[in-house]
């Protein structure tokens, strides 16, 4: 067979790294000053299991009087998510932002990213979250390869929402980490990726010239 090269998606660390300015601006835009802010960043579709996220937030709201939740993304399940929020009287605790051009800034605003997905490979959202030094609580369907920095905690989908809520509130208390070197070492630097692509193109051109 032909030889091929595997190149990882590079990430612009400067775009996703934690920035207090982004945290302040994003939180102010949804009237959240202090207190924990938990978030889902991704599509509102069956795979991402957003209805379970609402169930988890219902449990978190019992355990923490000030915690709030934000969905960054849109999708086919939005009407059901809105209905569930209303059913649980969580309108003052959950914000639906829809699809955003500034999703990268919200990694600085939230204290924990959750992903109770029914199935996943290696979602790039988790690479972005780790670039922001953000703690993540995800389902055990997510690939173990996603845990580049040790910031990801895996919870069995069959566990109760109370178990999920406990893990999430613990994650919210964790300090942010500077993950730039870890991501670079793992091959996610956009500069390194660009150099790899350039090298492959140059090698390919040289081979053609020799033919």
Predicted feature residues:
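Carbohydrate-associated surface elements
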Residues: 10
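A short helix/loop element that forms part of the nucleotide-sugar donor recognition site in Leloir-type
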Residues: 17-32
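A conserved mid-protein helix/loop that constitutes part of the nucleotide-sugar donor-binding site
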Residues: 36, 40-59, 76-82
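Nucleotide-activated donor-binding/catalytic signature segment of Leloir-type glycosyltransferases, i.e.
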Residues: 82-98
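Aromatic "clamp/platform" in nucleotide-sugar-dependent glycosyltransferases that forms part
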Residues: 99, 118
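Short hydrophobic beta-strand element within catalytic cores of glycosyltransferases
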Residues: 135-139
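A charged, aromatic-enriched C-terminal amphipathic alpha-helix characteristic of glycosyltransferases
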Residues: 175-211
């Amino acid at each position: 067979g032909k030889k091929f090269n595997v190149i990882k998606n590079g990430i612009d660390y400067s775009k996703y790294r934690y920035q207090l300015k982004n945290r302040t601006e994003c939180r102010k835009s949804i009237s959240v000053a202090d207190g924990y802010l938990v978030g889902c960043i991704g599509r509102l579709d069956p795979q991402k299991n957003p209805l379970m996220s609402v169930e988890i937030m219902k449990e978190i709201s019992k355990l923490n009087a000030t915690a709030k939740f934000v969905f960054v993304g849109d999708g086919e399940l939005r009407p059901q998510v809105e209905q569930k929020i209303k059913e649980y009287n969580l309108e003052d605790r959950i914000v639906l932002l829809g699809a955003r051009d500034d999703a990268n800034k919200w990694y600085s605003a939230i204290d924990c990213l959750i992903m109770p997905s029914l199935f996943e490979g290696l979602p790039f959202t988790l690479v972005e979250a780790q670039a922001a030094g953000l703690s993540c609580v995800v389902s055990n369907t997510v690939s173990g390869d996603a845990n580049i920095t040790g910031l990801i905690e895996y919870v069995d989908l069959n566990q109760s929402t109370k178990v999920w809520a406990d893990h999430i509130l613990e994650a919210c208390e964790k300090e942010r980490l500077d993950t730039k070197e870890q991501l670079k070492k793992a091959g996610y630097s956009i500069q390194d990726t660009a150099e790899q692509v350039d090298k492959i193109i140059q090698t390919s051109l040289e081979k053609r010239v020799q033919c």
